[in-house]
Regions:
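Short, charged, solvent-exposed linker or helix-capping segments at domain edges/interfaces
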Residues: 68-70, 77, 121-123, 176-180
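Short beta-strand-to-loop capping motifs
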Residues: 16-18, 113, 167-171
Length: 182
């Protein structure tokens, strides 16, 4: 069943088959995400957690082509997004990707490879107070569009690697991107 909720996220019916091993998907390290934002610091007042470090990698031209072929050409005519691979592993029961907004993209399409039953949480942040407003649990091989301008986090399963291919839109907002995926 496809799920669509307010302006945070939308599941879409897109599938990608990756040939070869997951090790072949990634290439050069693009970025390590470990900076704390005010949203995560606010949640830390109420929830004891450790921030996991997520790493994004560049992908091969073959993977880029395969992923971009799943995006409507009309959307690609507006913006050619950056394609990347992310992996993060929780070290213990308190590990999470803390609440954050993505500072360099405003929308992403995530092609989930391994999710371990982990849930993505969305928050409202106002006057230093953070409150959960929505969440979704993606399964392996599902595709979701996320509004990355709204604070979000992921509670990680210990010693399990979360993996996905992502597509970053730097200029095209969530509302416009989802309009191409009815």
């Amino acid at each position: 069943m496809l799920y669509d909720m307010n302006n945070c996220f939308k599941q879409i019916d897109v599938k990608i088959k990756f040939n070869g091993s997951l090790a072949d998907i990634k290439s050069d390290l693009h970025m390590s995400h470990s900076k704390w934002q005010k949203y995560g610091l606010s949640l830390k007042r109420d929830v004891d957690y450790d921030a996991a470090i997520a790493n994004t990698f560049e992908v091969s031209d073959e993977i880029k082509s395969e992923v971009l072929s799943t995006i409507p050409i009309e959307l690609l005519n507006i913006e050619i997004p950056h394609v990347w691979y992310l992996e993060v592993t929780g070290s213990d029961d308190t590990s999470m990707i803390p609440p954050h907004i993505d500072s360099f993209r405003i929308c992403t399409i995530n092609y989930y490879i391994n999710t371990n039953g982990e849930t993505t949480h969305y928050y409202k942040y106002e006057s230093g107070v953070i409150k959960e407003i929505d969440s979704f649990c993606s399964n392996d091989n599902e595709c979701w569009i996320l509004n990355t301008t709204i604070p979000h986090s992921v509670k990680l399963v210990p010693n399990k690697k979360r993996q996905m291919i992502g597509v970053s839109f730097l200029n095209t907002p969530f509302e416009k991107v989802i309009s191409f995926f009815p």
